[in-house]
Each structure stands twice: as structure tokens, then as C-alpha cells.
């Protein structure tokens, strides 16, 4: 039962941090140290994948009508606009898809270290503050999804590719990239959510294939609880973020990332010195 309670806590953390631009990895790397599941390291990696699936399903549910090109309630023009959204999502995912397929194992083995996570938390925290200060008072060039051009999409896609570095935050990287080229906060955030669907489903499927599907009854319970909690909390987090950015900028998240990065440095740095 203790692992079930831990799964609930992990699900809450994943649901919040996957969509707010504050790095789910940065939080989970500390959580893993404080609340390690008694199921082995391989299972924990699988658990992380499954709770991510719960998070991405929340986006699918919230935006199902907007992203469904087969809806009988849509006119022919609306269906065409929906297909255009998917085309832009697929193009934006290409850089991350190519790098993920070729270098997934290398990234996990080489870059998944606490000091990389801490550094990326701080770097992108500073970026958020700098970009928001630079854009202050300027009218965004892109205020509608339809105004996103192919070059813009590819630039945002490259930022999503860079988010494969642990601690970067996939949502954080793509939002920063979009803001830098004049995309409004609401369009940048929604596009980030849409980009997550194929990328996270693809990444999750890749890891599920690697780890296999053989679990004990307790492990199945832990996976299901974590996924459901992550799904529910993600719905709340997504709705909160879309409401928050209507009146606020992203600087608060930038400051939070810097503080968390320093905490990660201190937490693991002191452990390393005392070891």
C-alpha cells in the first residue's frame, strides 16, 4: 500500500510539472531520491512513462473537439482547419522525432545526470525572464494558430528537440522558442500542448517496447493509480495555465526554475561531497 501512496504523489507531481514550464524531470529526480518505489529501477522508468501517458491523455480529452477532424458538428471549412493543425503539429515534431529515434539511448545514458538537470533548469529560467523582458510592451506577431508559418513551426520544433536534454522542460523549451519569434502566449502554449501528443505517445511507446509488458498485480495497480492521478491533475494544471497566461507572463516560472535548479545543485552536490 505504501507504493500506492507514492504512486499518487508521483502522479500529482507529474500532472502539475508536465504542463507548467518547470520541468517534470527536475522534480521527479528529487522525488525519486525521497520516495523511491520498492519495485526496482527498471520498473520506475516504466512508471515514469505510464504517468506521462496519463498526462498526455488529459490534452486529448480537453482538446478532443478542436483536434478531431471527423467531428460531424464541424463544417467542411472547420474540418480543413483541423487538418491544418495536425499538419503543423507533425511538421513541428519532425526534429524531435528524428533525434529521439537516433539518440534516445545515448541521451538517457549520457545526459540524465542531476547536474545537467540543474543547469538546464537555471538556463531556461533565465531565458524565460530575458525573453519576457525583451517582448514587454510589444504586440505579438502571431495571435492565431492559422498565422503560424512553416519556418516558425520548424524553429519551435528545434526547441522541442533541445528539450530532450533532461531538466529543460518540453513545454518550457517550446514556449520560450515560440515567444522569441513573436508568438502570443496563448498560441505558444496551445501549440505546445498539441506538439506533446505525438512526441510523448511516441516516446512512451518506444520505452514500453524496450521494457516489455510483464508486471505483477501490485505493479499493475501502481501503474494504473499513477496514470489516473496524473490524468486528473493534468486537466486541472492545463486549465489553470491557460487561464493564468491571459493576464500574466511566464517570468514567475522562470524565477521558480532558477530556485529549483539551485536546490537540485545543493541537494545532490552535498550528497556527492559527503559520499
Which residues are covered by each model-predicted region?
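Multi-pass membrane proteins that catalyze or facilitate reactions on polyprenyl-/lipid-phosphate substrates
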Residues: 1-275
Amino acid at each position: 500500500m505504501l507504493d500506492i501512496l507514492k504512486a499518487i504523489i508521483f502522479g500529482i507531481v507529474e500532472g502539475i510539472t508536465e504542463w507548467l514550464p518547470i520541468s517534470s524531470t527536475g522534480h521527479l529526480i528529487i522525488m525519486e531520491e525521497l520516495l523511491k518505489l520498492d519495485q526496482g529501477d527498471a520498473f520506475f522508468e516504466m512508471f515514469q512513462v505510464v504517468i506521462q501517458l496519463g498526462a498526455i491523455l488529459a490534452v486529448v480529452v480537453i482538446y478532443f473537439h478542436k483536434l478531431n477532424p471527423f467531428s460531424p458538428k464541424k463544417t467542411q471549412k472547420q474540418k480543413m482547419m483541423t487538418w491544418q493543425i495536425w499538419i503543423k503539429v507533425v511538421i513541428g515534431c519532425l526534429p524531435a522525432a528524428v533525434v529521439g529515434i537516433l539518440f534516445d539511448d545515448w541521451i538517457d545514458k549520457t545526459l540524465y545526470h542531476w547536474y545537467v538537470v540543474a543547469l538546464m533548469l537555471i538556463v531556461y529560467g533565465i531565458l524565460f525572464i530575458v525573453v519576457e523582458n525583451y517582448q514587454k510592451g510589444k504586440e505579438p506577431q502571431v495571435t492565431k494558430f492559422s498565422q503560424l508559418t512553416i519556418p516558425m513551426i520548424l524553429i519551435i520544433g528545434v526547441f522541442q528537440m533541445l528539450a530532450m536534454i533532461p531538466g529543460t522542460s518540453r513545454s518550457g523549451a517550446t514556449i520560450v522558442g515560440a515567444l522569441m519569434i513573436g508568438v502570443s502566449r496563448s498560441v505558444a502554449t496551445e501549440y505546445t500542448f498539441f506538439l506533446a501528443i505525438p512526441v510523448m505517445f511516441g516516446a512512451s511507446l518506444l520505452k514500453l517496447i524496450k521494457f516489455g509488458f510483464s508486471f505483477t498485480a501490485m505493479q499493475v495497480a501502481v501503474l494504473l493509480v499513477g496514470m489516473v492521478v496524473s490524468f486528473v491533475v493534468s486537466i486541472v494544471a492545463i486549465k489553470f495555465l491557460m487561464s493564468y497566461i491571459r493576464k500574466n507572463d511566464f517570468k514567475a516560472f522562470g524565477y521558480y526554475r532558477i530556485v529549483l535548479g539551485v536546490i537540485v545543485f545543493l541537494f545532490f552536490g552535498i550528497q556527492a561531497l559527503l559520499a
